[in-house]
């Protein structure tokens, strides 16, 4: 089993947490990632800062600007990832970002760097499966999971293309919009997850708009994992280099809610 498959094979839903690499500075990210693990996160998503994060809401857009303003480069993100892997050999780490930093030096180079840094998976926000002749094959060839996105507009005709070649988990974006701005109705999430699970052979994690333990617990009742990003990024914005404590506190509350959600209905 891989680190990612192990994270979803614990007999309970998984908590997936996101922060932007290099926010507020490359050096400060290490302690924030450690806080996520100490708080109980099962999977870590590390954002690759980009100048035009079109799928992200204000919180993560500002995180990208802070990171880039601190001088964060792609090499810094891989350094952060490699150091994380050395400290946490069993915790899955996923890079999330946009195509430009991933393909500028070639998909094969990017995939090789992922392997060297101990990265388990990659989420590329702006390359749909129909337009991915290079990055997906390069990652799969290197043994790195390619984690695709499904949305409320992913219908039965398109879902097979999204699932083909996907591994690790499927990320269901519960709202058609940008990150962190709103949460979808619980009924629509339940319907979508049930529909996707009829075809998917990998876990389904749900994100976008999840900010509180109560929201996370509701989703965890039906999904294999819950993704939380903007709420954690907001804490980094508020506390800067001192964010590790507040991040750990919120992560612990989220983890407790997600991990116990199924017990309430058992």
Curated annotation (Swiss-Prot):
CDD domains listed in its UniProt record: Tryptophan_synthase_alpha
One Pfam family here: Trp_syntA
Domain of life: Bacteria
Class of this enzyme: lyase
Record GO terms (molecular function): tryptophan synthase activity
Keywords: Amino-acid biosynthesis, Aromatic amino acid biosynthesis, Lyase, Tryptophan biosynthesis
EC number: 4.2.1.20
A GO CC annotation given for this chain: cytosol
UniProt-annotated catalytic positions: 45 (proton acceptor), 56 (proton acceptor)
UniProt-listed Gene3D superfamilies: Aldolase class I
Catalysed conversion reaction: (1S,2R)-1-C-(indol-3-yl)glycerol 3-phosphate + L-serine = D-glyceraldehyde 3-phosphate + L-tryptophan + H2O
Pathway(s) annotated for this protein in UniProt: Amino-acid biosynthesis; L-tryptophan biosynthesis; L-tryptophan from chorismate: step 5/5
The family this protein is said to belong to: Belongs to the TrpA family.
Subunit structure: Tetramer of two alpha and two beta chains.
Role summary: The alpha subunit is responsible for the aldol cleavage of indoleglycerol phosphate to indole and glyceraldehyde 3-phosphate.
Descriptive protein name: Tryptophan synthase alpha chain
Organism of origin: Novosphingobium aromaticivorans (strain ATCC 700278 / DSM 12444 / CCUG 56034 / CIP 105152 / NBRC 16084 / F199)
């Amino acid at each position: 089993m891989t680190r990612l498959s192990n994270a979803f094979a614990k007999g309970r839903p998984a908590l997936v947490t996101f922060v932007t690499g290099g926010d507020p500075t490359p050096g400060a990210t290490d302690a924030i990632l450690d806080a996520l693990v100490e708080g109980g996160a099962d999977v870590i998503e590390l954002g690759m800062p980009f100048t035009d994060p079109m799928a992200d809401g204000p919180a993560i857009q500002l995180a990208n600007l802070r990171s880039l303003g601190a001088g964060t480069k792609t090499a810094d993100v891989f350094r952060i990832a490699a150091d994380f892997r050395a400290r946490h050999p069993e915790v899955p780490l996923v890079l999330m970002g946009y195509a430009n930093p991933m393909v500028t030096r070639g998909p094969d180079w990017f995939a090789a760097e992922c392997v060297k840094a101990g990265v388990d998976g990659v989420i590329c926000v702006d390359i749909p499966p129909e337009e991915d002749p290079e990055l997906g094959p390069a990652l799969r060839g290197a043994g790195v999971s390619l984690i695709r996105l499904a949305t409320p507009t992913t219908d039965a005709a398109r879902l097979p293309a999204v699932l083909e070649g996907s591994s690790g988990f499927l990320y269901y974006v519960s709202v058609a919009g940008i990150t962190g701005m709103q949460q979808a109705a619980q009924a629509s999430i339940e319907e979508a997850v049930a529909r996707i699970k009829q075809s998917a052979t990998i876990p389904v994690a749900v994100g976008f708009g999840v900010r509180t333990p109560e929201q996370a617990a509701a989703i965890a009742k039906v999904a294999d994992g819950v993704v939380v990003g903007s709420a954690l990024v907001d804490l980094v914005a508020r506390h800067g280099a001192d964010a590790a404590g507040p991040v750990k506190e919120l992560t612990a509350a989220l983890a407790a809610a997600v991990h116990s959600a199924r017990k309430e209905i058992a």
